[in-house]
Amino acid sequence: IINFILVGISLYEYEKVCECLAGDFAALPGLVSKHWLANEENNTYGGVYIWETEEAMQNYLESELFHGVGANPALANAESKEFEVIEALSEITRGI
């Protein structure tokens, strides 16, 4: 899960930029899904990523895409937290 705030751009502008990047994320090896998050009232945005393997996630964290997005000054105070999926419970609730 990654969270950040927007600095100097609106939600609309952010969405337009992300539309251009969505295909790059979709092409990432091992990415099962990415859910884009927004809370305009609190100026908090981010994403929930589901990976096939920890190796796929680590490859993303070392990629040009990750570092390029992270270097964008409009995305400030970025925080990333890693979690493991509890498979048995997630299956019950139709998780991926």
Q: For each predicted feature, which ranges?
A:
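Residues that cap or initiate secondary-structure elements
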Residues: G8-S10, E55, I86
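Short, well-ordered beta-strand segments in beta-rich or mixed alpha/beta enzyme
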Residues: I1-F4, H35-S63
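Short acidic, gly/pro-rich beta-turn/loop elements at beta-sheet edges
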Residues: Y12, M57-N59, S90
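Glycine-rich beta-strand-turn "strand-cap" elements at beta-sheet edges
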Residues: L6, L37-E41, V69-I96
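Short amphipathic alpha-helical segments
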Residues: F4-S33, E64-V69
